[in-house]
Amino acid sequence: MTDGLQWDYNCSVDVLSAWIGTPEPCDEVAVDDSVVIRISRKTYQPVGIDIRFASRRIRWTGALDGSLARALLHQHGPAAMNIWQTSRLHR
């Protein structure tokens, strides 16, 4: 699910963003106050994540990289898919 993961950390707003592949139309699913998963409208799979307050999730900010995004995408991806699928049923 996370092969080819690219990431960027914006320290001025403390947001770690990660994505797979090229940008495409997505639906965003907030799984908690600081994590948003992006679901592809084409493949119906998680293709990105935004992590607000990313530095709070790790002790050393030098470790804010793709491994944190990859771990959180694996952790929250299934819940995001459930939320997304439920929301599509009610449209």
Task: Give the predicted meaning of each segment.
Residues 10-11, 40-41:
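Short, acidic, Ser/Thr-enriched surface-loop or helix-capping motifs
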Residues 15-20:
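Short, aliphatic-rich beta-strand segments
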Residues 24, 53-56:
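A short acidic/small-residue loop/turn micro-motif
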Residues 27-31:
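Short loop/turn motifs at secondary-structure junctions and domain boundaries
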Residues 56-68:
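A short, polar/charged loop-to-alpha-helix boundary motif
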Residues 70-91:
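Cysteine/selenocysteine-centered motifs that mediate thiol-based redox chemistry or coordinate metal-sulfur cofactors
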